[in-house]
């Protein structure tokens, strides 16, 4: 099952076809449905696309304190899409993107897949990335929290691996428009592990993902979260924007509520889905290339979206799965019964992103 088609109303077909005819090279490769979605949801207009980009670029002079290391059309466009073509908001996000990197120089030193810290995090499944997209065309990212071996991976390196993964994925214009979903499985995540999630490092993650990256997040789903994760969530709430809070869903062990938002056919069996269990090494092999190894140092430094697209299936056949801890929420698909939603649980579906 592919992404849901968003077809124009009959009376708008001629206008819609005209927009496709005027499509710029920046929209090349997008499906007609995605182009129409960008027009309806993001206010993307091919007639003024280059003017929109230039107006954001013209604002750079107002922030001489920031080094804008990349200002090409394709790069600025992703910030416009992330902010629904509100130019001032798009520029603010662009400035925060580079300012975050200036303020956290150590995080972005040797910022590539073969950096030892990033490589370890990737191999341990941080993050997991499902091959197929959901029914809205969104990419699904997974985090199995209990797999965090604190003697092996620092939280900062896990965050770096997530940010690097997003940098690779956001090169795909379809994902700039359709966005992402994040599912965090807290099964077997101990209180001792949780005690390492200090306010300062959580704030660092929120600033990097919420305030400084041009991605549209359609939802962050907590599954099997213990009471102390609820407490941590209360702790970080002041750092979250209202829009972000509305997109955090606390499912507990109620996978039925998860399936109301993400159909089981797009989920691995750990989340009651119909897909096979997730192989924790899949995304690491995609980024690291055919020389991926759990044990040997990796020396190949290049990666790009085209390489990811064309080699992923071959690598999956060549490499065996890496055994990791699994979620306790494995159930047979279709056997879940409807449960009453808890008063404090956000389980409203998101049909469109703000």
From Swiss-Prot:
Quaternary organization: Forms a complex with clathrin heavy chain and gamma-adaptin.
Broad class of the protein's primary localization: Golgi
Regions of compositional bias (Basic and acidic residues) in chain numbering: 335-344
Expression sites (tissue/organ): Expressed in brain with no expression detected in non-neuronal tissues (at protein level).
Spans annotated as Disordered: 317-354
Record PROSITE patterns: CRAL_TRIO
Function of the molecule: Required for normal morphology of late endosomes and/or lysosomes in neurons. Binds phosphatidylinositol 3,5-bisphosphate (PtdIns(3,5)P2).
Domain CRAL-TRIO: 118-279
Domain note: The CRAL-TRIO domain is required for targeting to the membrane and for binding PtdIns(3,5)P2.
GO molecular function: phosphatidylinositol bisphosphate binding; phosphatidylinositol-3,5-bisphosphate binding
Record's compositionally biased regions (Polar residues): 345-354
One Gene Ontology term, aspect cellular component: trans-Golgi network
Membrane topology: Peripheral membrane protein
Top-level taxon of origin: Eukaryota
Gene Ontology biological-process entries: lysosome organization
Keywords: Cytoplasmic vesicle, Endosome, Golgi apparatus, Lipid-binding, Membrane
More info: Binding to PtdIns(3,5)P2 is not required for localization.
Protein name as it appears in the record: Clavesin-1
Location within or outside the cell: Golgi apparatus, trans-Golgi network membrane; Early endosome membrane; Cytoplasmic vesicle, Clathrin-coated vesicle
The organism of origin for this protein: Rattus norvegicus
């Amino acid at each position: 099952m592919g992404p849901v088609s968003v077809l124009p109303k009959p009376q708008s077909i001629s206008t819609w076809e005209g927009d496709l005819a005027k499509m710029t090279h920046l929209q090349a490769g997008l499906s007609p449905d995605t182009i129409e979605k960008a027009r309806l949801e993001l206010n993307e207009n091919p007639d003024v696309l280059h003017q929109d980009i230039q107006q954001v670029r013209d604002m750079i002079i107002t922030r001489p304190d920031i080094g804008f290391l990349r200002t090409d059309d394709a790069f600025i466009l992703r910030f416009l899409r992330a902010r629904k073509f509100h130019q001032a908001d798009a520029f603010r996000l662009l400035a925060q993107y580079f300012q975050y990197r200036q303020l956290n120089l150590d995080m972005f030193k040797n910022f590539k897949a073969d950096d030892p810290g990033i490589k370890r995090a990737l191999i341990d499944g941080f993050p997991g990335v499902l091959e197929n997209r959901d029914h809205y065309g969104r990419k699904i990212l997974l985090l199995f929290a209990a797999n965090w071996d604190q003697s092996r991976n620092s939280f900062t390196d896990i965050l770096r691996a997530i940010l690097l993964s997003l940098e690779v994925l956001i090169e795909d214009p379809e994902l700039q428009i359709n966005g992402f979903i994040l599912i965090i499985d807290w099964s077997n995540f101990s209180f001792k592990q949780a005690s390492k999630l200090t306010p300062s490092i959580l704030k660092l993650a929120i600033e990097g993902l919420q305030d400084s990256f041009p991605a549209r997040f359609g939802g962050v789903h907590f599954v099997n979260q213990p009471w102390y994760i609820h407490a941590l969530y209360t702790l970080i709430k002041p750092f979250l924007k209202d829009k972000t809070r509305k997109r955090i869903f606390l499912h507990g062990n109620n996978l039925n509520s998860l399936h109301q938002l993400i159909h089981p056919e797009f989920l691995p069996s750990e989340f009651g889905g119909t897909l096979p269990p997730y192989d924790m090494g899949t995304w690491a092999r995609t980024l690291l290339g055919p020389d991926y190894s759990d044990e040997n140092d990796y020396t190949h430094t290049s990666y790009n979206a085209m390489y990811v697209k064309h080699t992923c299936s071959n690598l999956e056949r060549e490499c065996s799965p890496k055994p990791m801890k699994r979620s306790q929420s494995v159930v047979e698909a279709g056997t879940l019964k409807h449960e009453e939603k808890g008063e404090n649980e956000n389980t409203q579906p998101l049909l469109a992103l703000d």
